[in-house]
Design a protein with these regions (language model features):
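C-terminal segment of classical bacterial N-terminal signal peptides
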Residues: 2-9
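Transmembrane beta-barrel domains of Gram-negative outer membranes and organellar outer membranes
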Residues: 10-164, 168, 183-191, 195-197, ...
Length: 250
């Protein structure tokens, strides 16, 4: 789920959604808060709001350990989490940068994330909902060193280990695919950034936006997440969100 011009000062774990080629420095921490309102909202019922605080701590040998606590709020309740208005999850995660070449602008990372519901599991029409799954990924990044504002590109595979097909892939049948990212500095403090998970599933979004470096080791990102199934069934899903977040390294 970052500005290339600030990589010497920051080492964020994601661009918007996909893992970046960075890891937080050993002994440092990174906190982020994401806010995503569904836009446009559904024709009937309440729109969804996503709140996601994230904490990452840098470990030895270019590793990092983190935890996300995303919560999806929808007035009127959600059958997938026992009709609660808020579906909460916890996502411990780990990332390792196993290769880097600063002179060539190259890095390779791999990682894993465990997605587990906090509201407990339930069954709807005999089908288990709100299951636990694991995300595994790899990512290659290349910084193109042309002038002061060369871009950085990211690409790699991902796969999800999930025992229940109907849960993770509720809008499709894709349990893996590719991740792509692009970070283009526009000035010393502003960059255009975009990332994409392929597939019609929980992660399947394209998100372009702007990243702004702030004083005090802070960062603000604003973008728009477009679900890969967004216009399916005559636009019935409206699977699109404004994506806002603030992050700070400490």
């Amino acid at each position: 789920m970052f500005v290339v011009a600030a990589q010497s000062a920051f080492a964020q774990s994601t661009i918007f959604n996909i893992p970046s080629g960075d890891t937080v420095d050993k002994g440092k921490g990174y906190f982020e808060f994401d806010f995503l309102p569904q836009a446009p909202g559904p024709d009937a019922g309440s729109r969804i709001y996503l709140y996601n605080p994230r904490l990452v701590v840098g470990g030895p040998h270019d590793t990092e350990f983190g935890v996300n606590i995303p919560a999806f709020h929808q007035g009127g309740g959600n059958a997938a989490c026992n009709l609660s208005s808020t579906c909460g999850y916890i996502e411990p995660n780990f990332k390792w940068k196993f290769y880097k070449n600063d002179d060539e602008g190259l890095s390779f990372v791999t990682g894993v994330l465990l997605h587990t519901p906090l509201n407990g599991k339930t069954t709807v029409a005999g089908v288990s909902q709100n299951e636990t799954w694991g995300l595994f990924y790899g990512n290659f990044t290349k910084k193109i060193k042309t002038g002061d504002y060369g871009p950085r590109i990211s690409a790699g595979p991902y796969v999800v280990a999930d025992s229940n097909l109907t849960d993770f892939t509720s809008v499709g049948a894709h349990r893996g695919g590719v991740i792509l990212g692009y970070e283009q500095p526009l000035s010393k403090k502003v960059s255009f950034v975009a990332d994409w998970y392929s597939g019609k599933n929980y992660y399947g979004y394209f998100t372009p936006g702007i990243s702004i470096t702030l004083p005090g080791n802070g960062l603000f990102n604003a973008g728009y997440s477009i679900g890969n199934d967004s216009w399916a069934n005559s636009n019935a899903t409206k699977n699109r969100y404004v994506f806002l977040y603030y992050g700070v390294t400490f």
